[in-house]
Amino acid sequence: MATIHIDYLGDLRTGCTHLQSGTHINTDAPTDNQGRGEAFSPTDLVANALGTCIITTMAIFARRDGIELAGSALDVTKVMSSEPPRRIARIEIDLVLRTAPLPDDETRTRLEKIAHTCPVAISLHPDLEQAVTIRWEEATAEVA
């Protein structure tokens, strides 16, 4: 059974529906490739998939150890190749993990390894550079 239904809307745009939940998103070609840039581009969604997979997979494993990662945040930068063929050359992820209390070094190392081995990370082509920076911060009382 299909997971996603995609309609081509014309003018380099698509409408995408997640069939299980009914959630809907649109895509648009980027401005540097004839689009308007008014929605995520397909390559933006690849970069987004890596970031969301990293934090979701880390949170699954953190939860097993009683560690809450709510309040953590990522900034994702997608860098396109300057030479043909057009492709994503690099995805930079700046991840701030906020938790209280901070986990011990062994737990941090185990969780950080997940950033490089989540399902999306290991599914992407090896020529696509994945630059992941992780910083740990103690969560404030409002977040923890």
Task: Label every PLM stretch briefly.
Residues C53-I54:
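Alpha-helical metal-binding/catalytic segments enriched in His/Glu/Asp
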Residues M1-N48, A59-A144:
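Extended beta-strand/beta-hairpin segments
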